[in-house]
Amino acid sequence: MLEIRRPSIESFKQLNHFFRIVITDTFNKEGIGDNLEDLEQEIEMKKAYLESDINSNGENRYFLFALEGDIIIGSIEYGPASNLIKTCTNNVLKDLPEVGTVFVHPDYQRNGVGNLLLREIYLTLMKKGIEEFCLDSGYRNAQKIWNKKFGEPDYLLKDFWGEGYDHMIWKVKVKDVF
């Protein structure tokens, strides 16, 4: 049975292992798996985000995880807009929360786990009175998904990560997607 849960100190090690699995898989599927420095940076950033959530009890960052039994199969979080989003939008989106760390374990993809996590984060944002958020992606496979869900990005940074590797940023109204 699928369960959505908040992180705990006890689950920290398991969650970090989950990040390593999904980020490594994402890098490999994107054809950038040999870029080990960026891979490790991405994993460390997610660990830091998770620590921020646990240390602030969800005030600074707010994670949700999907579990099937005792196996973590998905993640999502929201928190302050990243420096990348602030810089690339000339601070236009600096005051919006950013939804991110949307990952589904490779063995559970295309089964609705991501949609369930999105629905839960939309509910959380609504309960907190948050009407819009931003979301960004440099991963081509994820960009296809976000384009279907949110339409064309509000910001398109061509070849931002190298030739053929764009970066996209969306500004989304919760009422438009929920």
Describe every region a protein language model picked out:
Residues 14-21, 49, 116, 120:
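Alpha-helical elements of Rossmann-like donor-binding domains used by nucleotide-donor carbohydrate transfer enzymes
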Residues 1-34, 176-178:
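Conserved N-terminal entry element of GNAT/NAT acetyltransferase domains
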Residues 115, 139-157, 163:
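Conserved active-site alpha-helix within GNAT-family acetyltransferase domains
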Residues 104, 110-123, 148:
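Conserved acetyl-CoA-binding loop-helix of GNAT-fold acetyltransferases
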Residues 61, 165-169:
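Short hydrophobic/aromatic beta-strand or adjacent loop that forms the aromatic wall/cage
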Residues 125-138:
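Conserved GNAT acetyl-CoA-binding A-motif
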Residues 22, 40-100, 105:
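Acetyl-CoA-dependent GNAT
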